[in-house]
Amino acid sequence: MGNGTEEDYNFVFKVVLIGESGVGKTNLLSRFTRNEFSHDSRTTIGVEFSTRTVMLGTAAVKAQIWDTAGLERYRAITSAYYRGAVGALLVFDLTKHQTYAVVERWLKELYDHAEATIVVMLVGNKSDLSQAREVPTEEARMFAENNGLLFLETSALDSTNVELAFETVLKEIFAKVSKQRQNSIRTNAITLGSAQAGQEPGPGEKRACC
Amino acid sequence: MALVRGAEPAAGPSRWLPTHVQVTVLRARGLRGKSSGAGSTSDAYTVIQVGREKYSTSVVEKTHGCPEWREECSFELPPGALDGLLRAQEADAGPAPWAASSAAACELVLTTMHRSLIGVDKFLGQATVALDEVFGAGRAQHTQWYKLHSKPGKKEKERGEIEVTIQFTRNNLSASMFDLSMKDKPRSPFSKIRDKMKGKKKYDLESASAILPSSAIEDPDLGSLGKMGKAKGFFLRNKLRKSSLTQSNTSLGSDSTLSSASGSLAYQGPGAELLTRSPSRSSWLSTEGGRDSAQSPKLFTHKRTYSDEANQMRVAPPRALLDLQGHLDAASRSSLCVNGSHIYNEEPQGPVRHRSSISGSLPSSGSLQAVSSRFSEEGPRSTDDTWPRGSRSNSSSEAVLGQEELSAQAKVLAPGASHPGEEEGARLPEGKPVQVATPIVASSEAVAEKEGARKEERKPRMGLFHHHHQGLSRSELGRRSSLGEKGGPILGASPHHSSSGEEKAKSSWFGLREAKDPTQKPSPHPVKPLSAAPVEGSPDRKQSRSSLSIALSSGLEKLKTVTSGSIQPVTQAPQAGQMVDTKRLKDSAVLDQSAKYYHLTHDELISLLLQRERELSQRDEHVQELESYIDRLLVRIMETSPTLLQIPPGPPK
């Protein structure tokens, strides 16, 4: 799974990061896309995304990962944020049970705004702080299974499972797309600009309308 | 208990005597609705009274019969109550036949009222708690619901109940933290002075006279004496209502009185006479002031005691001023400036003299100088006016501070440093350059120079206040404000007070006002010494005003430092000339930050807090608006050109 060049990709998958404030969404993103980690604990303001292209088999998949503040309040950006997303990482902080307790609320919001076919992974972040763990792995795993979610525990700090988490999600998305598209492996790009507005539901179904 | 008793063998085991009782009004329920209009809500507050001391909670607005205050106050137990408690205790051990007779002396009376925007506040209910009975039940904290009754003699109806926590305490523990701190530092140094002063004090008379002059002074500066009456009257009303204001006023008054007493007893008499003689304004003021002074002591014992200390400290400066006039007291000089202005004003000396003395010795006198000039012009009135002037200038400066705390400090500092030459020049012409040596004075002088500018500024300000004071001329408004702020000039801390006091006075009708007026908001807060001082050297009037107030505060600070070096280590560092003064000012400003709150009464602190909360909530709203705006922008970006949101690939770290 090497990094492809920015221009050279077959698919663009929009993946959103969601979860409570302070669970480490932004650091997961920076770890995955830039291999950076910041101890600066400032909360994210606004919305931004970062991309990284990975090779899934023969296909170059550009992951476009969106990040925003994990605020409870309703935001005008909510629907735009989820629109067109084919994957989501629902992150909680395994050292703070409260962030896990509200996962269901996040799931609801996700399904309210995103496609039903979206690939969702439950991510227990901060696994490096095992001594402060408040959420048992099995409990989270059970919850994920019961809700049809993927599950991993990660650490953006020491990089544990960060790549794996994203790639797993991308693979899942890719598998779904491939299944739907069957043999058509031509450039199906979910491009942000043009595709976004007229995007059809379903992961990977969006073609760049060039 | 055992420990306590052991510590006081003399009293014996059953003789633990509380000196204070701390009353926390938690909440009420089942209150009757009084507001006309929607539902049966009321704007409820509770007056807590023990003996002659009274406190009032804040007003919980639009409560549906169940306001929650959670506000506490502490009462010094009156001597009579003490006996009652003692007997009650003894009663525990054995029958005390005389216990019942003294019970009336220590009743806690809780009167819940509805604040009416118009007209008299409405009675919601009253509960009377016999403190000796409570104490008889043990020293532990008592929290209990008390049924609210109708006024005695009136038909009893369901009025709900009020939950109160009563805790008996001993010593000053119940008093504010400041009290304790004060004891350690400023008190000791000033205590001597205090004592001396006290010997000379004639509280009632003096305070009254003192108050009057301050109010009067303001007017002269503006030049519209006739207006003063109105303004004063306005303030007085406010004062009457708000105890805190009265306090500050009284403190000022006492200071002035003290100074006057010590320095020029003879003058006081005449001054008072003049005040009374002078048209309604002065008389008003005098009478009002007298009331305030009389009331204030009763209302807030603890704080009052505390404030007294402050006053004493303040007093000390005036005294020093006096001394300076006669002889130069190095230590007292700085202090002199602050109070000095008042003192001088009070003094019966000819107007010309006042000028010189003021300019020379008093920092606050900067304004005074101008005043003094007018003084001479005015002639007989001048005596009365002089006071008001001094106060006015102070008050105005204070008001300015409120608006521009930071800038004010900076300005203050700046004037001291930047205008030394000017100041000196001013002094010389006045003919009393000798005493001027203190930097504070210089700053004040600079301020005085800027007075003309100030006046202009004042007008705009007044405009701000116009809403409150309809029909009053700007100058009047300014005077009013100054009146409200009388307390300010004396102490470094006091200026803040006074400013807050002003706000309250303005807003006294309803506590709400303070929050609404942008200008007023800042005033309650103490000056922010550090940041502002160096940055802003602009010669704005506001600055000058602030500088005055700062100078005053700094003067107080200096006094403290002089008397007790321990208080402000920073100031101790010896520096030459005005530089030292400016630094001191800065230091004092820092100290002022906490000092401003020293004199605040419980009510004042609460109102300040409420104001802050209001401001915060307003800010929150603003933040939310901004957030939603940003969100909307983001949505547009996401829908049109989302690539703008891509995190730019920065250089690898």
From Swiss-Prot, chain B:
UniProt keyword list: Cytoplasm, Cytoplasmic vesicle, Endosome, Golgi apparatus, Host-virus interaction, Membrane, Mitochondrion, Phosphoprotein, Protein transport, Transport
Ranges for domain FIP-RBD: 586-648
Domain C2, first and last residues per copy: 5-146
Full protein name: Rab11 family-interacting protein 5
Pfam families: C2, RBD-FIP
Matches recorded under InterPro entries: C2_dom (IPR000008), C2_domain_sf (IPR035892), FIP-RBD_C_sf (IPR037245), FIP_classI (IPR037789), Rab-bd_FIP-RBD (IPR019018)
Subcellular location: Cytoplasm; Recycling endosome membrane; Early endosome membrane; Golgi apparatus membrane
Modification note: Phosphorylated on serine and threonine residues. Phosphorylation at Ser-357 is PKA-dependent.
Gene Ontology biological process terms in this record: cellular response to acidic pH; insulin secretion involved in cellular response to glucose stimulus; negative regulation of adiponectin secretion; regulated exocytosis; regulation of protein localization to cell surface
The organism of origin for this protein: Homo sapiens
Primary gene name: RAB11FIP5
Organ and tissue specificity: Detected at low levels in heart, brain, placenta, lung, liver, adipocytes, kidney, spleen, skeletal muscle and pancreas.
Function description: Rab effector involved in protein trafficking from apical recycling endosomes to the apical plasma membrane. Involved in insulin granule exocytosis. May regulate V-ATPase intracellular transport in response to extracellular acidosis.
UniProt free text on domains: Binds to vesicles enriched in neutral phospholipids via its C2 domain. The interaction is favored by Mg(2+) rather than Ca(2+).
GO molecular function: gamma-tubulin binding; small GTPase binding
Oligomeric form and interacting partners: Interacts with RAB11FIP4. Interacts with NAPG. Interacts with RO60. Interacts with RAB11A that has been activated by GTP binding.
GO cellular component, one term: nuclear speck
